[in-house]
């Protein structure tokens, strides 16, 4: 037994001339790895301006190749988190977001495609956000971050460090506690889409709306209280 319940394989989100190895040629390898094991295999694909053109091909080929295998879970589409130059060069347009929505809605294998909370903005379904609650990301620096989307972002607080603090201490830290507290109600509550969207991705809102301030708590509250930068309304 592998001692694991799931293995996630990240699919290349861009192709270079040097990349000539395809995951689809390695099915026998995966069959051997998961033989007589209860673990599942999932795939991650980050959707950005660079990878958008290959999205439909990647999703269809991955699902078609692995859906008959009992160990296959789903292919998860990860929403690109824009930082720095990526804010203008790699972020998706509203038209591209609609294309992603239609790709999912028109698929006959929806059960094999995972969108997740950051895609609630598409208005398809609500996946409850578990930031700072059911999820804790430990970085290489030992710091516990509330979500992958704001990993290594420390301008609004730090929960603690695994080298010095217990998981419970970091979960109950002021930073994590404030995120959970502020993520209950916000300015989008009156919107007809709110029951599905829930104002979008908290990590995306923090990255997009953060401004330097001495009052980190109020800044955090303002960011969480804002609309998702890719609001589809």
Where do the PLM segments sit?
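Radical SAM enzyme [4Fe-4S]-AdoMet core and its adjacent flexible, acidic
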Residues: 2-145, 149-165
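Flexible mid-to-C-terminal extensions adjoining Fe-S/redox cofactors in radical SAM and related proteins
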Residues: 149-233
């Amino acid at each position: 037994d592998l001692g694991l319940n799931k293995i996630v394989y990240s699919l290349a989100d861009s192709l270079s001339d040097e990349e000539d190895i395809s995951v689809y040629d390695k099915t026998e390898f995966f069959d051997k790895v998961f033989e007589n094991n209860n673990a599942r295999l999932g795939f991650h694909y980050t959707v950005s301006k660079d990878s958008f053109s290959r999205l439909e091909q990647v999703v269809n080929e991955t699902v078609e190749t692995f859906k008959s295998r009992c160990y296959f879970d789903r292919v998860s589409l990860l929403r690109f988190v824009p930082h720095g130059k990526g804010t203008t060069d790699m972020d998706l347009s509203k038209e591209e977001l609609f294309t992603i929505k239609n790709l999912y809605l028109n698929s006959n294998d929806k059960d094999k495609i995972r969108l997740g909370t950051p895609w609630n903005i598409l208005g398809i379904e609500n996946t409850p956000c578990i930031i700072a609650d059911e999820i804790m990301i430990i970085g290489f620096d030992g710091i516990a971050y509330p979500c992958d989307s704001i990993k290594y972002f420390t301008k609004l607080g730090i929960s603690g460090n695994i080298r010095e603090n217990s998981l419970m201490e970091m979960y109950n830290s002021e930073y994590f506690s404030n995120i959970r507290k502020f993520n209950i109600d916000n300015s989008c509550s009156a919107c007809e889409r709110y029951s599905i969207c829930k104002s979008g991705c908290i990590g995306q809102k923090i990255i997009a709306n953060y401004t330097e301030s001495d009052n980190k708590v109020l800044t955090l509250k303002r960011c969480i209280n804002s609309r998702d930068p890719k609001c589809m309304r």
